[in-house]
Amino acid sequence: MRILGIDPGTRITGYGLIEKIGNRLLHVDNGAIYTRTDAPLADRLKTIYDGLSRVIADYAPTGVAVERIFVAKNALSALKLGHARGVAMLAGVNASLPVAEYTAVEVKQAVVGYGRAAKPQVQQMVRVLLNLPEIAQEDASDALAVAICHAHCFHLNDLLT
């Protein structure tokens, strides 16, 4: 199973691809899609959609996992993040891929074993679990964590059904 994890954002959208073979998780690729902060929101969303569509076409994942929105203090930021999430989900659905969503607490629990883990702990565990030489760029590391969460949760759902 090849999983595309996405950490959506209107400024930077991180992506991470992993391959689950048996009980092993293998790193395939990771990166970030950057948008121009001075560009209109619609143009930024198109940049995100086009970038994720290219990643999907290049790597042919079998599923997509997206970080679910959190409750934000700034309503405008939350709305913009919601737009980025929608575009990320649309890229997956338009490629006929199943799309799953996970909260930050679920991701941290799956990766570190503690739902309130600090970001550096999550980044370090992603590095260890995927045998990376160094910690990935922050948004890409978050996306890899979402993909790892999906790999673990998908396996658990398989066992339960």
From Swiss-Prot:
A cellular component annotation (GO) from this entry: Holliday junction resolvase complex
Top-level taxon of origin: Bacteria
Binding residue positions for Mg(2+) 2: E67
Pfam families (alphabetical): RuvC
Cofactor requirements of the protein: Mg(2+)
Note on how the cofactor is bound: Binds 2 Mg(2+) ion per subunit.
Family, similarity comment: Belongs to the RuvC family.
Protein name: Crossover junction endodeoxyribonuclease RuvC
